[in-house]
Amino acid sequence: MTCYRGFLLGSCRRVAGGRAALRGSGSGADGRRHLGHGQPRELAGGGSPADGGFRPSRVVVVAKTTRYEFEQQRYRYAELSEEDLKQLLALKGSSYSGLLERHHIHTKNVEHIIDSLRDEGIEVRLVKRREYDEETVRWADAVIAAGGDGTMLLAASKVLDRLKPVIGVNTDPERSEGHLCLPVRYTHSFPEALRRFSRGEFRWLWRQRIRLYLEGTGINPTPVDLHEQQLSLNQHSRAFNIERAHDERSEASGPQLLPVRALNEVFIGESLSSRMPYCWAVAVDNLRRDIPNLKGLASYYEISVDDGPWEKQKSSGLNLCTGTGSKAWSFNINRVAAQAVEDVLHIARRQGNLTLPLNKDLVEKVTNEYNESLLYSPEEPKILFSIREPIANRVFSSSRQRCFSSKVCVRSRCWDACMVVDGGTSFEFNDGAIASMMINKEDELRTVILEQ
């Protein structure tokens, strides 16, 4: 169990404080790309002004699980000593001292956040992933994610109240980019951030999120926490069990609103494809060893965009992102390399008898302009869906490999598929299940913009 000064994780001890209110309103803004550390320059001038300031009376601090803590928990049943853990990590090529150093840096910065809040008379609860639940969110006036972007996604996942602010603080700027966090200067100067909050010297950023409905036959709306449990072998080998028991959920059910909102993205695909970008490599390696016939099945589904006609597709999966997520996995799925742009320009010049001057500057300019067109403001109420490696033949087609939309519906024809939300929460999504994804203003996430 990790100890922070004044707190013992698991006990959720509180620090007494005063009472205050939150004030503010939101409106839309455009943005382009992330630059530097912390919040992106694209947000400069964006968001909406704070109407006065805000000073929360009760704050929950969600601290990330460091790699050192993860390794400890991973082998907790073996009752390893610190020396045993050191030797085990060495066998895997990992540095025990390096992990411990990063852990201490994170812990020190979390303590700085807690002390800063306590000095302002604010009640604080410090929790880890396992203690972070709906009751804790209801108790708090604001949520602080102490870690990196992954911790910010975790903190946001439980907040369904659009008026409750969620603030990210990067606790290890040397190892974490922290796009969704405050600028890194506030990691060590958090009292200054609190003063600026109370004076209203910031802007609100209302990040759009995707809500999900699940309906059809054989659905299971129970979420699986990938970080805590890692998807079990039994769950994903079920489709290959010839003597599979009768599914009691075979009858069709109406639309059910799932208890999560996607801040970055939703990925839909066969389980191996859906897991690889998010889970630890060891889990994937274990699956491959235990189920050798699972070698990356193509995902088979039908898709309808903005209530249009259904289209059958096979691909490596489907990614649906928000403006926040357009800078993450979606960007890397769709971005083009300068080499590809140069080849296309060569062909265009040859086929069109053009006198286009092909030089490095032109190639770089065209490449950057195309890639920047893939990004859009976190406040824009639209979804960008992308088809990964679509299969095109006389049976299957992909009329739009990438497109903006307000609503996307997917009917699964998969055998062992998952619908993964922000890389941390998974839902079964097998044959007969239908997912509907859309943007709703009620799901906005209230975050802040602070200048450097």
From Swiss-Prot:
Keywords: Acetylation, ATP-binding, Kinase, Mitochondrion, NAD, NADP, Nucleotide-binding, Phosphoprotein, Transferase, Transit peptide
Disordered: annotated span: 23-52
EC number: 2.7.1.23
Means of activity regulation: Inhibited by NADH, NADPH and NADP(+).
Reactions this protein catalyses: NAD(+) + ATP = ADP + NADP(+) + H(+)
Transmembrane segments: none
Modified residues (Phosphoserine): 176, 377
Transit peptide: 1-50
Primary localisation category: mitochondrion
Enzyme class, broadest EC rank: transferase
Superkingdom of the organism of origin: Eukaryota
Keyword check for Chaperone: no
Cellular location(s): Mitochondrion
Residues recorded with modification N6-acetyllysine: 64, 327, 407
InterPro entries found in the cross-reference section: ATP-NAD_kinase_N (IPR017438), ATP-NAD_kinase_PpnK-typ_C (IPR017437), NAD/diacylglycerol_kinase_sf (IPR016064), NADK (IPR002504), NADK2_mit (IPR012355)
Any one GO BP annotation for this protein: NADP biosynthetic process
GO terms, molecular function: ATP binding; NAD+ kinase activity; protein homodimerization activity
Gene Ontology cellular component list: mitochondrial matrix; mitochondrion
Modification type N6-succinyllysine: residues: 64, 312, 327
Alphabetical list of Pfam families matching this protein: NAD_kinase
The UniProt record lists the keyword Ribosomal protein: no
Oligomeric and partner information: Homodimer.
UniProt family annotation: Belongs to the NAD kinase family.
Role of this protein: Mitochondrial NAD(+) kinase that phosphorylates NAD(+) to yield NADP(+). Can use both ATP or inorganic polyphosphate as the phosphoryl donor.
Name the UniProt record assigns to this protein: NAD kinase 2, mitochondrial
Species whose genome carries this gene: Mus musculus (Mouse)
